[in-house]
Amino acid sequence: RIMAALSRGQNPGPESSIMKNLGANLGQRITELALEAVGDYIVPHQPWQPGSNDLPVGPSAGTMAMPRYFNLRASSIAGGSNEVQKNIVAKLVLGL
């Protein structure tokens, strides 16, 4: 619906704000679950050094779990904070 409205040159309505909030919350929950799954192997960064024979510590998912978590925390701010998006929905749907 959102893309169809935009292609017709119309305002996407409150759906885009709702989808933004749902997507941000879902992404954050998924990365929180990934951190729990990786457990003690959470590492913020393991840079590869040329010529190094060091093996990565823990499962390969552990090397990106923390950066993804931090990156997706910003998704609730980017494009307007969740609170701003909720205010937009309240104005458009409820007329507040």
Map each language-model feature to its residues:
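Alpha-helical interface subdomain recognition
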Residues: 1-96
